[in-house]
From Swiss-Prot:
Signal peptide: 1-25
Keywords: Biomineralization, Disulfide bond, Glycoprotein, Hydrolase, Metal-binding, Protease, Secreted, Serine protease, Signal, Zinc, Zymogen
One GO-annotated biological process of the protein: protein catabolic process
Phenotype of null mutants: Viable and fertile, when reared on a soft diet. Tooth morphology is grossly normal but the enamel surface is fragile and rapidly abraded. Although formation of the enamel layer is initially normal, the crystallites fail to thicken and interlock. The enamel proteins enamelin and amelogenin are not cleared and persist in the matrix during the maturation stage.
Domain Peptidase S1: 32-253
Protein name: Kallikrein-4
Amino acid sequence: MMVTARTPWGWFLGCLILEVTGASASSVSSRIIQGQDCSPHSQPWQAALFSEDGFFCSGVLVHPQWVLSAAHCLQESYIVGLGLHNLKGSQEPGSRMLEAHLSIQHPNFNDPSFANDLMLIKLNESVIESNTIRSIPVATQCPTPGDTCLVSGWGQLKNGKLPSLLQCVNLSVASEETCRLLYDPVYHLSMFCAGGGQDQKDSCNGDSGGPIVCNRSLQGLVSMGQGKCGQPGIPSVYTNLCKFTNWIQTIIQTN
């Protein structure tokens, strides 16, 4: 088994995991699988994280001054795009580009197993919520197998190019038993799985840190997957945010 982060550099992180788990290598593809263009600004909590090299991860606005993302997306500083639909749009109406210099990983984040894969990023200024920029509540109830949830992101397409427009895909939550069976020995209770259906719908590299929304709440963050994306019977892994509500609230209140 090879597990890879859902970042553009997921292959490199996957190779690190091979050394730990003794897993065999397999090919990696990079995209949201079998998705479609989201309706413009239908996911107003979606954030895009940029470094000097360009877009590298997604995030989620959970407070006017705080964005959640995957811990493996950590950088020293960020430009955070909010209210974006078209990544290539120049000054898209209703969007903001904000600097952020403070990010706090969960103290128990485990690289390379991806346990507790979340961090909070504090924007240098608060945003005023609008039709295009709006925070989303973090789920307090854990996901139920069979729930239909929506994942969104700008991960690479089948042709290897990044999409201009935000992509959306509906996935079904897998059982804990299935997730544990497929991802041992790196499986952890901070994770849940979704996807893996015969329709081959999936998240993939480039989608890391982005939202999976169930029942109008932020249920999780795109974290990692196993080998090639979109394999029937192989769901991807998401950070299980219902386990972290107290930590999230404490960090926001004390920083």
